[in-house]
């Protein structure tokens, strides 16, 4: 099971608490897959919604394929996520009742198929972000101090 990472969504970990993760497939066109093989995708500001029992990914930007013809895809089109019915039901209930959102965390190839890891997330407040930044700075300072000490 080889996985080749296409892109990460680092902003999601900064802006949200990730409660649970799901792996989903996506319905794509041929030129989209070719663009993804080159690594031309952007997950920032993208999110998933559930409509009529189906999950869709919005604002996922996949650049047009350079060598595509007039049949090239729309870069910002809505893409259907392939999840099990129970997973979609769980996501829908959490979004509707408890104020969660679904954000894509990473996009990757798994055994030749494009997969997206989506996370059930709750938004962070500003003080949470500051607290995380302080912890990150402290960890970095400790790592630098240990490195200096071991020299």
UniProtKB/Swiss-Prot annotation:
Entries under Gene3D superfamilies matching the protein: 2.40.280.10
UniProt entry keywords in alphabetical sequence: Cytoplasm, RNA-binding
Molecular-function GO term, any one: RNA binding
The keyword Cytoplasm appears for this protein: yes
InterPro entries for this protein: SmpB, SsrA-bd_prot, SsrA-bd_prot_CS
Biological process, per Gene Ontology: trans-translation
Locations listed in the record: Cytoplasm
A single GO cellular-component term on record: cytosol
CDD domains (UniProt xref): SmpB (cd09294)
Disulfide bonds: none
Function statement: Required for rescue of stalled ribosomes mediated by trans-translation. Binds to transfer-messenger RNA (tmRNA), required for stable association of tmRNA with ribosomes. tmRNA and SmpB together mimic tRNA shape, replacing the anticodon stem-loop with SmpB. tmRNA is encoded by the ssrA gene; the 2 termini fold to resemble tRNA(Ala) and it encodes a 'tag peptide', a short internal open reading frame. During trans-translation Ala-aminoacylated tmRNA acts like a tRNA, entering the A-site of stalled ribosomes, displacing the stalled mRNA.
PANTHER family named in the record: SSRA-BINDING PROTEIN, TMRNA-BINDING COMPONENT OF TRANS-TRANSLATION TAGGING COMPLEX
Listed HAMAP family: SmpB
Family as reported in the entry's similarity comment: Belongs to the SmpB family.
Protein name (Swiss-Prot/TrEMBL): SsrA-binding protein
Gene: smpB
């Amino acid at each position: 099971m080889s996985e080749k990472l296409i892109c990460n969504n680092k902003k999601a970990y900064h802006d949200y608490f990730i409660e649970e993760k799901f792996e989903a497939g996506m319905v794509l066109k041929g030129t989209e897959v070719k663009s993804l093989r080159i690594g031309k995708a952007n997950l920032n500001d993208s999110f998933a919604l559930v409509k009529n029992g189906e999950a869709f990914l919005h604002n996922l930007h996949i650049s047009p394929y350079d060598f595509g013809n007039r049949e090239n895809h729309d870069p910002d089109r809505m893409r259907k996520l392939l999840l099990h019915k129970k997973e979609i039901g769980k996501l829908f209930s959490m979004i509707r009742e408890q104020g969660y959102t679904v954000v894509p965390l990473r996009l990757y190839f798994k055994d030749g198929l494009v997969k997206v890891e989506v996370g059930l997330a709750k938004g962070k407040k500003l003080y949470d972000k500051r607290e995380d930044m302080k912890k990150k700075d402290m960890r970095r300072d400790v790592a630098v101090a240990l490195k200096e000490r071991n020299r």
